[in-house]
């Protein structure tokens, strides 16, 4: 009888161990699947702008940019005039580094053409109405090789005539049309592209072609 009881206890222990092992494997598999779902989340796709989506908004080619309007960077206060002392600029106006996935995708993408623009004689900048802290955090996380400019409260955006008028309430008030402006060292606008659809922005190839057309 005692021998039978020992065998029964051993059998129960083995069954419990197998069950616990199965639970552990199931939990591990669930964690692995969850990780794969998070890691495989697709990035927002930004489509290239077409001729029909380009709009005539903001300052025109040949106009003077608002040189004295204040901007903020992670290093402190500056102006467009001071920035242009470093050479001609290509400025990408974007809605928000914080909540606009199309903007985030574009800002990461143009990192690839920093050197191409420098070879053509232009410094690249991104501009949004976000605070310098938010821009700096995004820039460091994405290892951006160009400077972000903070335009609070959208004075430069307004100076360029780029405020998107459809937003009159909520966090999007003050955002610009998704735009690219090329400015010479004297502050004259020498090329531009303004999109009427924030989901569509100039591709890197289109940006370089815009510069090459000058």
Report residues per predicted region.
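Thiol-/selenol-based redox modules, centered on thioredoxin-like
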Residues: 173-214
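N-terminal "domain-start" segment that seeds a small globular fold
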Residues: 45-82
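Short active-site neighborhood of thiol/selenol oxidoreductases, capturing the structured segment around
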Residues: 80-104
């Amino acid at each position: 009888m005692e021998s039978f009881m020992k065998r029964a206890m051993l059998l129960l222990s083995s069954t419990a161990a197998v069950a616990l092992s199965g639970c552990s494997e199931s939990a591990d598999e669930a964690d692995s699947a969850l990780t794969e779902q998070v890691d495989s989340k697709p990035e927002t796709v930004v489509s290239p702008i077409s001729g029909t989506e380009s709009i005539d908004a903001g300052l025109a080619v040949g106009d003077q940019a608002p040189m004295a309007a204040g901007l903020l960077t992670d290093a402190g206060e500056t102006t467009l005039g001071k920035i242009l002392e470093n050479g001609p600029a290509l400025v990408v106006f974007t809605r928000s580094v914080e909540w606009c996935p199309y903007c985030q995708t574009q800002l990461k993408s143009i990192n690839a053409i920093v050197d191409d623009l420098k070879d053509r004689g232009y410094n690249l900048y991104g501009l949004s109405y976000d605070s310098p802290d938010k821009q700096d955090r995004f820039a460091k996380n994405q290892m951006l090789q160009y400077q972000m400019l903070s335009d609070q409260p959208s004075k430069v955006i307004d100076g360029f005539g780029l405020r998107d008028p459809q937003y009159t309430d909520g966090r999007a008030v003050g955002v610009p049309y998704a735009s690219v402006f090329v400015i010479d060292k004297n502050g004259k606008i020498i090329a531009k592209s303004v999109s009427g659809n924030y989901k569509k922005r100039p591709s890197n190839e289109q940006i370089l072609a815009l510069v090459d057309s000058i």
